[in-house]
Amino acid sequence: MIVGLHHVAIGVDNFDKALTFYTEALGFEVVQQSEFDNDANANQAIGLDGIKAKMAMLKTPNAFVELWQYSQPAPQDLRSRPCDYGYPHIALQVDDIQAEYDRLKTHGMEFVGEVVHLSDDASAIYGRDPSGNIIELYEIKSKEIAQLDR
């Protein structure tokens, strides 16, 4: 039985810069940090040979985000657009979208434009982390699709 979403993994091109952004700008907490250098168990679990990577597990209010920077195999820059297949973005629910938008801009987050009010109870805006991964800020007041229990 599936009991919930545990984490979302995000590939980054500069581990230290990403870790600083996700902890200082977004307020996530580091709960685990590891380095892998051709570890047999990691190779088998991930399905790649000879991996060399850094990983950090970050705690959010109701799930985890995992940051990965691989140096082997050599990563490719496959930044997605919101319309591409795969995992094109993560959404962070916020309680004051304009305040978070303004605050994250001071941390260097680049947004596609200004906050959009989608309806009376929903607002959203897309931006990118320092590695170019898409992050949506989402303010929703409707209890049916608001944040799950913490």
Residues covered by each model-derived region:
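Vicinal oxygen chelate
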Residues: L5-D13, Q33, K54-E66, Y70, L78-R150, ...
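Core segments of cupin and vicinal oxygen chelate
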Residues: G11-N62, T106
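Short beta->alpha connector loops
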Residues: D49, Q72-P73, D96-I97, H117-L118
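Acetyl-CoA-dependent GNAT
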Residues: Q69-P75, E139-I140
